[in-house]
Each structure stands twice: as structure tokens, then as C-alpha cells.
């Protein structure tokens, strides 16, 4: 035990009441932090960091916490909130809590009770807590009536996270992140979302939720094996009136999504990705193309496109009813195409593509591509194509260079 204090020792109690920061690292035999009898005297703690305390079973936390980071505590199964008044009921509010990180807590099943509020929470990181099926505890009504149980949703519809800006959920057994009927302001300030190694995740954005993410700037999806579509645009609840889809998104990275077949299950009816700058698609083996020609017109600010190790990709931009457009990716600066065995060309539709800012092209192991485009491509700043990390080739334009590479595979 860390604080094994007799409640009659006034000087020790006075010091404990002044404690506002507690950092515990590498204490493998620590089983308890404080006596249960005096735990309420530990209620002014604002910063709590606990790492590698393998034997710690329960953890008391105060309501005035600002930062909580718990890592590699294998025996920890419960977090207990200290109330100023014993027997207090009703909602518990963490009015100052801004950052929460829960990592490698294999036995943690309860992080917070159902009646809890986080009006200031900005950053939440949860990684490898396999027993934690939901962020807050189930209500008694859900426990008594299984038909009301929304346990498939990691964030229940009763929880509001209206200040959350950064969310990491990694290596969690979660099927659905958020309930479509969660509070209307919840997640509306989210700027960065990272979902990694969530092997049961079925979807990310439903039609009722996607309208909330107007501030999202960075989206990373990695190793979510059951994820077949990122954006579900129909089939959940009626969509809200929306003028743009993800208008502030600047970086989209998707990798190792083995079942991903498309971005969305229905053609978007509103403009999307208007501020997207960087797009990275890696090891998505069921994708055959990225966008249709008309869809690609939305990506007017795209500067970097990296498409690698996608076994079934045949073209980057798919045919779109014979439409010819000359303004695809006008801001493009860097294009990387690597390990795409079935890629035939960038786009099969005719028309002159104008890429006045393109400066870097890297290609490697694209054996099926005979020419980059059917027609001309204007790239005034492009002077070479990287065919290895350092080796370059150039025959006057991109089409001729790609064609030469196809006819001379050992180049």
C-alpha cells in the first residue's frame, strides 16, 4: 500500500489533502494505493499517472482530475470515483478532466459509471483493454432487461462528449462506436480520429452521425478486418440535411483493411473531401478503384496520393458514363503507385488531365499498366519518374515513360 495512514494522524491527513499530483511507475508489488477508510481525503488529486503497477487491483480517482493516464496495470479491474459525500447519488461530473488514456489494462471492465459527465474532455485514448466493452457502465435497466442493452456501442446514447477533439480506439473488441441517437452536440468538435486493430468494427460513419463531423481534420483507419465500407449513407436512420461531407478533412489514411470494397455504400449526394490534402491507401486488397470521375472532382485540394499494395486495384479513377473532365486533382504535387499488380491505368476515360503542380511521381511493381492515361497529361513541372528510391527515368512525358517501363520490365 502506498498511503497506509491511520485516520487519527492529523499531520499525515493534512499532507494527503494537499496532494494534487501522483505519478507511480514500475511498482510491481503495489496492490492498493490508499486505505479505503480515508480514501475520501485523496479527493483533490488533479494529475494521475500510473504505469507498470502489475498487482494494482482497484484505483481511486477524484472528481477534480485534469489528466489521467493508466498504462500496463494487468490486475486492475475497477476504477472507483471518490465522492465528497458518502452515499451520494445522481450524476458524477468531471468538470476539469481534459485527457484520459487507458492502455494495456487487460482486466479493466468498468472505467466509469453510467451516470457520469465529461464537459471538458478533449483527448481520449483507449488501447488494448479487451474486457472494456463500453466506455461507461451499463445502467441497471439494461442489466435487468437485456433487450434494451446497447452493448454493441462503445459510447452509449446517454453519454455526451461535446468537447472531444482527439479520439484513439485501438485493439478493442468494439463493433459500433457510437449510437445514432446520442446527444446532438456529442462528437461535433472531433478533429482527429484513429481506429486501429479493432477486428470486430463493422462501420465508422452512419448517415445520422456523419453530419456531426464537420471539424474532423485527420482520419486514420488501420487493421479493421470486418470493415467493408467507411461511410454508410443509407440503411440506418433518415439522413439529416447536410450541405457538405467532412468539409475540414485534410488527411485520410487507410491501411490493412482486408474487406474494404469502397468508401461508401451509396453515391454521395453532397460535395465531399473539399479540403483533403493527403490520401494514403495501403494494403486494401478488395478495392478495385478509389473514385469515379465525377467524384474525383471534389478533391480539388489533394496534393499527395499514395496507393500501395492493393492487389485488385485496376484503375485509380473509374469510368463515369463517358464524361471527360480536365480538372482532376489540380493541386497534385506527389503521386506514389507501388505494388499494384492489376493496375491498368490511372483513368480509362479520355480527356486532357491538367496537373500544373505535379513534381514527384514514384512507381514500382505495376506490371499491367501500359500507359498512364489514354490521352494527354499536362505536367509542366514533372521532369522525372522515380522507379526505385533513388533511380529515375524520363522520356519527355509521363505516358511515354510509363509505356517504356512496361515494355522494358528490367529497366
Residue ranges of predicted features:
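Cross-kingdom leucine-rich repeat
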Residues: 1-411
Amino acid at each position: 500500500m502506498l498511503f497506509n495512514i491511520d485516520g487519527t494522524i492529523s499531520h499525515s491527513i493534512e499532507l494527503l489533502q494537499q496532494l494534487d499530483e501522483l505519478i507511480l511507475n514500475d511498482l510491481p508489488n503495489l496492490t492498493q494505493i490508499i486505505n479505503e477508510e480515508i480514501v475520501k481525503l485523496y479527493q483533490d488529486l488533479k494529475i494521475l499517472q500510473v504505469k507498470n503497477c502489475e498487482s494494482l487491483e482497484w484505483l481511486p480517482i477524484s472528481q477534480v482530475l485534469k489528466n489521467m493516464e493508466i498504462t500496463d496495470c494487468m490486475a486492475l479491474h475497477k476504477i472507483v470515483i471518490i465522492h465528497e459525500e458518502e452515499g451520494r447519488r445522481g450524476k458524477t461530473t468531471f468538470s476539469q478532466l481534459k485527457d484520459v488514456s487507458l492502455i494495456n489494462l487487460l482486466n479493466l471492465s468498468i472505467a466509469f459509471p453510467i451516470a457520469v459527465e465529461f464537459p471538458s474532455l478533449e483527448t481520449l485514448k483507449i488501447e488494448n483493454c479487451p474486457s472494456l466493452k463500453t466506455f461507461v457502465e451499463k445502467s441497471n435497466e439494461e442489466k435487468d432487461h437485456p433487450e434494451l442493452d446497447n452493448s454493441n456501442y462503445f459510447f452509449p446514447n446517454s453519454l455526451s462528449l461535446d468537447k472531444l477533439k482527439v479520439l484513439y480506439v485501438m485493439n478493442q473488441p468494439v463493433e459500433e462506436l457510437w449510437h445514432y441517437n446520442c446527444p446532438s452536440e456529442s462528437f461535433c468538435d472531433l478533429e482527429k480520429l484513429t481506429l486501429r486493430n479493432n477486428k470486430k468494427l463493422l462501420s465508422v460513419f452512419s448517415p445520422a452521425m456523419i453530419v456531426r463531423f464537420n471539424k474532423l481534420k485527420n482520419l486514420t483507419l488501420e487493421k479493421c478486418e470486418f470493415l467493408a465500407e467507411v461511410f454508410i449513407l443509407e440503411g440506418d436512420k433518415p439522413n439529416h440535411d447536410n450541405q457538405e461531407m467532412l468539409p475540414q478533412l485534410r488527411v485520410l489514411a487507410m491501411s490493412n483493411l482486408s474487406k474494404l470494397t469502397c468508401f461508401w455504400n451509396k453515391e454521395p449526394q453532397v460535395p465531399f473531401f473539399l479540403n483533403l490534402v493527403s490520401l494514403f491507401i495501403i494494403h486494401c486488397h478488395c478495392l478495385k478503384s478509389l473514385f469515379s470521375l465525377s467524384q474525383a472532382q471534389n478533391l480539388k485540394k489533394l496534393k499527395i496520393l499514395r496507393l500501395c499494395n492493393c492487389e485488385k486495384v485496376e484503375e485509380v479513377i473509374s469510368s463515369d458514363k463517358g464524361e471527360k473532365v480536365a480538372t482532376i486533382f489540380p493541386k497534385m504535387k506527389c503521386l506514389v503507385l507501388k505494388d499494384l499488380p492489376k493496375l491498368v491505368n490511372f483513368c480509362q476515360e479520355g480527356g486532357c488531365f491538367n496537373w500544373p503542380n505535379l513534381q514527384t511521381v514514384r512507381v514500382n511493381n505495376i506490371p499491367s499498366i501500359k500507359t498512364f492515361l489514354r490521352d494527354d497529361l499536362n505536367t509542366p513541372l514533372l521532369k522525372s519518374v522515380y522507379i526505385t528510391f533513388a533511380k529515375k527515368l524520363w522520356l519527355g512525358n509521363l505516358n511515354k515513360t510509363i509505356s517504356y517501363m512496361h515494355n522494358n520490365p528490367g529497366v
